[in-house]
Amino acid sequence: MARKGLVERWKKPKKFKTREYTRCKICGRAHSVYREFGICRVCFRKMANEGKLPGVRKATW
């Protein structure tokens, strides 16, 4: 319930641009969000393993 309230508050426009911060589009997580994809590392890893992110592969060396 607390997270839902934070997500709703995050969606409202901010008075100052510097107060805006990135959140995951899927789960709403505020930390470790990749700008290029707009999702957090947890969702990124899950979606990459499922093959839902085109062009993303596991590194092998």
Curated annotation (Swiss-Prot):
Zn(2+) binds at C24, C27, C40, C43. Its cofactor is Zn(2+). GO terms for biological process: translation. It comes from the Bacteria. Keywords: Metal-binding, Ribonucleoprotein, Ribosomal protein, RNA-binding, rRNA-binding, Zinc. Pfam families: Ribosomal_S14. GO terms for cellular component: cytoplasm; small ribosomal subunit. Binds 1 zinc ion per subunit. SUPFAM superfamilies: Glucocorticoid receptor-like (DNA-binding domain) (SSF57716). GO terms for molecular function: rRNA binding; structural constituent of ribosome; zinc ion binding. InterPro entries: Ribosomal_uS14, Ribosomal_uS14_bact, Ribosomal_uS14_CS, Ribosomal_uS14_sf. Part of the 30S ribosomal subunit. Contacts proteins S3 and S10. PANTHER family: 30S RIBOSOMAL PROTEIN S14 (PTHR19836), SMALL RIBOSOMAL SUBUNIT PROTEIN US14M (PTHR19836:SF19). Binds 16S rRNA, required for the assembly of 30S particles and may also be responsible for determining the conformation of the 16S rRNA at the A site. Belongs to the universal ribosomal protein uS14 family. Zinc-binding uS14 subfamily. This is Small ribosomal subunit protein uS14. It comes from Thermosipho africanus (strain TCF52B). The lineage of its organism: Bacteria, Thermotogati, Thermotogota, Thermotogae, Thermotogales. The gene is rpsZ.
